[in-house]
Every structure is written in structure tokens, then in C-alpha cells.
Amino acid sequence: FHSLVKRDTYLPFEGICLTDTFQTTENEENVLDQTWFPENAANVDKQKKAPVRVIMGNPPYSVGQKSANDNAQNLSYAHLDKRIAETYAKAAQATNKNSLYDSYIKAFRWASDRIADCKDGGVVAFISNGAWIDGNAQEGFRKCLEDEYSSVYVFNLRGNQRTSGELSRKEGGKIFGSGSRTPISI
């Protein structure tokens, strides 16, 4: 890195924002950030006003969390949850829509809303849980992707190990080794 930037000392990224991304659109002031981290709060405000055309990431998958002690604590985001209810849940025929509030689905909703603010649109690219590809509850999510985007490209890496027998064999094993039984998509 240092040879590429031709310097021996660390050069911090000027606009870095240390924040909970979903919290940035919850329309409430964070007094703690304003008081103790004013430079970071200013960077967050600046980022919120900037046009964003590309969002890339690997959002966490956490809908099955049992308690606050789990590694993937579920947090409530009133505005974001409302947007999911107005879009993905409203378009779904499924009775149980709980999986639409998984963090990776929230990331899609947040990103879709964020690039919609840009008059020329944009690109969202995630490595995510692939259950949305054929899950019953995610029907509304798929409908909204079709409505909100001009093109959708998906690489289904498969890997669903929550199946058994021939179906499990066809999934081709675990994508990330022994730690994950979840199907993955890009």
C-alpha cells in the first residue's frame, strides 16, 4: 500500500464514517455522536447528502437470532422496517413474513432506497444469503426487485445444506466450508 501511495506514514481516509448504516436513515439525532464524535457525525451528515450510485457489501444474516448475546444481534429500525412492510411484505402472499426482516433483506431495502435518491439510479451488489431466490416468504422481495430495477443479475452459488438426501447433494456442499449451511448468492 505505502509503495502505491508513495508515502511512509498512514494517511487516513478523509470521509470515513464509523456508524450503523441502517441507523443513518432513522431520522433521529444521535446526541452521543454529536457530543463525543462531532467529526464523525459531520462525516455521516455529509455522506447522507452525497449522491451514491454504487453500494457493495456482504450484509449479515441474522433473522434467527435467539438473544442479545448471540453474535448477530437483531436491532429494530422503525423506518426501515416500515419500508419493508410497505414494499416486500405488502407484495408477498406468504403468511409468515418474518424472514423479510433479516439483516440481509434490510440491507437490500436500505440500498434500494439510497440509490433511488440519485436521479440516474445506481447499482447494488451484495454477497448474501441466497434463500431469497426461491423462498416462499421472499416472493414479495423478488417482485419488488423486478419493479424497482431495470436489470437484475444473480449468481446462485447454491450450498443450501438445510436440505437432505438428493437435494442436499445437488446443492454441492457448503460454500464457506464447515461453518455455513446457508445458500449464497451474488
Residue ranges and their predicted role:
Residues 22-124, 131-135, 148-154:
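SAM-dependent methyltransferase catalytic-core segment centered on the flexible catalytic loop
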Residues 7-11, 120-126:
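Short, glycine/acidic-rich hinge or "gate" loops at secondary-structure transitions
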Residues 15-16, 50-60, 180-186:
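Extended catalytic-interface subdomain
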Residues 1-3, 37-43, 111, 137-140, ...:
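Short alpha-helical segments and helix-capping/turn motifs at coil-helix boundaries
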Residues 152-185:
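Class I S-adenosyl-L-methionine
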Residues 134, 141-144:
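GTPase G-domain guanine-specificity segment
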Residues 1-28, 71-73, 141:
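Conserved S-adenosyl-L-methionine
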